[in-house]
C-alpha cells in the first residue's frame, strides 16, 4: 500500500501524522509513505529528520478580514492543487490523509478530484477552517473529540482518537528522572507551556516559589528556551525551591511521561492525547490566543468527566496554581481517581483505528 500524508503549520498537525506513520510502519513495514508539506513550514524539518520522503507546495492561509492577500491565497491554492495532482499522479497512492493546517487543503482536494480515497483527521473539538472546507470532498472524517461531530456530515464521521496516543503508550522503557537529580520515589509534577513556553505560566510558577518550598512533591519545570534566562534570574532572586528543577526545553518529552504523576500544561490536542492515553491527571491552562478558543473547549471536555482541572489564563496566579497542584499531588485518593477517569478517555489504539478506516475506504 502507498499512502500520502499532508499536514503542517504546527506540531499539533505534524506529530499525529508522524505517530501514524511510525505505527503503520511497525505493523506493515512494506507500506510506502510520501509527506506533502510546505518548504518553509515546521513540517519540512521534522519530517525529513525522520527520513520520510517529502515534497513541497506553496500555500498560505486566508485572512479573516477582507484583504487583497486573500486573492493571492486563492491563486496559491489553485497552483497548489495542480502541483499536488502532479505529485499524486507520480506517486500513485492508494489513499491520502490530511491532518490539518493550510497545506493539506490543496493536497486532499486534488486527491478527491483524482478519485483517490481520502480522509481528514481532526485533532480538536472545534475544527479548523481547512478541515471544514475539505469535509464535503473526503470519504471519511476521523475525530478525537465527540464535540467535533456536530461540525461534519454525520455519515462520514468516525471516532479514531489521536495517533500520538499510540506512540506514547508503545514506549516500553521510559527515561529516568534521576538524570535531572529528581527523586523517583516522590510525586512529580511536570509544568510546561508548549514548545516555546508561556509567559503567564512562567509568571505563576515564579509567584508560587515560597509556598512550593514546604511541599512533599517535586516539580520538573520547563520554561521554554526563549524565556529560560529571564525566568531563572527571577527565580534566583526569589530563592530557588530545592524541590524544583528548571530546564529550558525537554527533548523527547514522551520518554519521560510514564514517570510523571501530574501535568500542568496548555490544552493542545497532542497533549490531551498523551495524558489520556497514559492516565496522567492534568491542570490545563488553555491558550486564549488560538482560533475560536478551541483549547478551552478541548480542556472542558475532560473537565466535565472530572478528568482534569481547568484554570483560565486570565485568572491564573501563583496561589491558584499551587492550590490546584496541591489538590491532586497532595491527595493520593484524588490523584488515583483522576488518573483512572483520565485513562478512561484515552484511545491508545488510535493509530490502528485510523489505519482500519483507511483500509475500509480503499477496499470498498
UniProtKB/Swiss-Prot annotation:
Pathway: Cell wall biogenesis; peptidoglycan biosynthesis. UDP-N-acetyl-alpha-D-glucosamine binds at residues 10-12, 124, 195, 295. InterPro entries: GlcNAc_MurG, Glyco_trans_28_C, GlycoTrans_28_N. The keyword Lipoprotein does not apply. Its EC number is 2.4.1.227. Pfam families: Glyco_tran_28_C, Glyco_transf_28. It is a peripheral membrane protein. Keywords: Cell cycle, Cell division, Cell membrane, Cell shape, Cell wall biogenesis/degradation, Glycosyltransferase, Membrane, Peptidoglycan synthesis, Transferase. Belongs to the glycosyltransferase 28 family. MurG subfamily. Cell wall formation. Catalyzes the transfer of a GlcNAc subunit on undecaprenyl-pyrophosphoryl-MurNAc-pentapeptide (lipid intermediate I) to form undecaprenyl-pyrophosphoryl-MurNAc-(pentapeptide)GlcNAc (lipid intermediate II). This is UDP-N-acetylglucosamine--N-acetylmuramyl-(pentapeptide) pyrophosphoryl-undecaprenol N-acetylglucosamine transferase. The lineage of its organism: Bacteria, Bacillati, Bacillota, Bacilli, Bacillales.
Amino acid at each position: 500500500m502507498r499512502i500520502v500524508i499532508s499536514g503542517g503549520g504546527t506540531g499539533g498537525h505534524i506529530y499525529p501524522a508522524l505517530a501514524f506513520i511510525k505505527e503503520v510502519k511497525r505493523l506493515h513495514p512494506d507500506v510506502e509513505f510520501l509527506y506533502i508539506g510546505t518548504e518553509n513550514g515546521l513540517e519540512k524539518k521534522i519530517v525529513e529528520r525522520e527520513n520520510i520522503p517529502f515534497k513541497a507546495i506553496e500555500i498560505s492561509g486566508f485572512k479573516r478580514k477582507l484583504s487583497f492577500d486573500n486573492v493571492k491565497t486563492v491563486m496559491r491554492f489553485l497552483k497548489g492543487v495542480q502541483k499536488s495532482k502532479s505529485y499524486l499522479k507520480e506517486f500513485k497512492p492508494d489513499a491520502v490523509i490530511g491532518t490539518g493546517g493550510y497545506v493539506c487543503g490543496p493536497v486532499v482536494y486534488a486527491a478527491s478530484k483524482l478519485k483517490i480515497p481520502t480522509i481528514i483527521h481532526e485533532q480538536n473539538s472545534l475544527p479548523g477552517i481547512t478541515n471544514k472546507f475539505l469535509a464535503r470532498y473526503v470519504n471519511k472524517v476521523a475525530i478525537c473529540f465527540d464535540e467535533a461531530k456536530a461540525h461534519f456530515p454525520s455519515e462520514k464521521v468516525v471516532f479514531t482518537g489521536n495517533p500520538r496516543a499510540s506512540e506514547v503508550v508503545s514506549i516500553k522503557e521510559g527515561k529516568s528522572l534521576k538524570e535531572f537529580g529528581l527523586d523517583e520515589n516522590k510525586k512529580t509534577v511536570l509544568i510546561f507551556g508548549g514548545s516555546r513556553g508561556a509567559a503567564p505560566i512562567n509568571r505563576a510558577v515564579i509567584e508560587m516559589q515560597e509556598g512550593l518550598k514546604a511541599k512533599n512533591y517535586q516539580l520538573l519545570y520547563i520554561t521554554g528556551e526563549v524565556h529560560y534566562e529571564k525566568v531563572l534570574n527571577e527565580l534566583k532572586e526569589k530563592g530557588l525551591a530545592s524541590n524544583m528543577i528548571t530546564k529550558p526545553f525537554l527533548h523527547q518529552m514522551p520518554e519521560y511521561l510514564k514517570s510523571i504523576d501530574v501535568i500542568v500544561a496548555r490544552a493542545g490536542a497532542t497533549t490531551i492525547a498523551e495524558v489520556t492515553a497514559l492516565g496522567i491527571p492534568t491542570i490545563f491552562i488553555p491558550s486564549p490566543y488560538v482560533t475560536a478558543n478551541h483549547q478551552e473547549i478541548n480542556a472542558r471536555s475532560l473537565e466535565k468527566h472530572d478528568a482534569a482541572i481547568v484554570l483560565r489564563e486570565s485568572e491564573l496566579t501563583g496561589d491558584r496554581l499551587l492550590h490546584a497542584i496541591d489538590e491532586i499531588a497532595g491527595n493520593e485518593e484524588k490523584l488515583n481517581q483522576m488518573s483512572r477517569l483520565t485513562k478512561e478517555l484515552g484511545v491508545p489504539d488510535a493509530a490502528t483505528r485510523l489505519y482500519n478506516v483507511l483500509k475500509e475506504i480503499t477496499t470498498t
